[in-house]
Amino acid sequence: MPNTHDFGPLVHISAEAVGNPGQRRFRLRALNSASESAILWLEKEQLSALGEAIESVLSAEEYVHQPLTADDTEPEPVFPLRPTVEIQLVQLSMGVNSESRRIVLIAADGPQGEDETHGVTMEFDYRNGFELRSQISRVVAAGRPPCPLCTAPMDPAGHVCVKKNGHQPH
């Protein structure tokens, strides 16, 4: 990727949804020590898959979460009004540096090798990974509940369940 911004180690990474259930957009917000920020827009399924991948890494690395004491709690980060980088994700890769106990994310807004593709690389420690995984779970679960029969999201205005009515739309 010729247009890649390396954020290095992050001081903060979080996941959030913007909008009402059924109309939500999902994003990761990242901030490094130089106050550079990134917003990575992604699909709900991508966010959920990232959370599962982080959970797998933490399990494989045998990470044991130690909650912060009240004295160690970090203040809420202040993000710049305009992010340094803002992209709609097309590709998201994750790696692990076991020596430094960091998770590495590589994100791009287009296919690898394209001249116009923009991307970011960033890394965060296992503690931030644990907290991000917990946050992703809450964000994803806060949407429309799945239908118990077909697992499609249930719309508050009504839900047509293909398993209940016996046919799928054409």
Predicted features by range, described:
Residues 1-26, 68-123:
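Intrinsic, low-complexity N-terminal interaction/targeting segments
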Residues 10-14, 18-48:
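Long, hydrophobic N-terminal alpha-helical segment
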Residues 37-83:
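Short, well-structured hydrophobic secondary-structure segments
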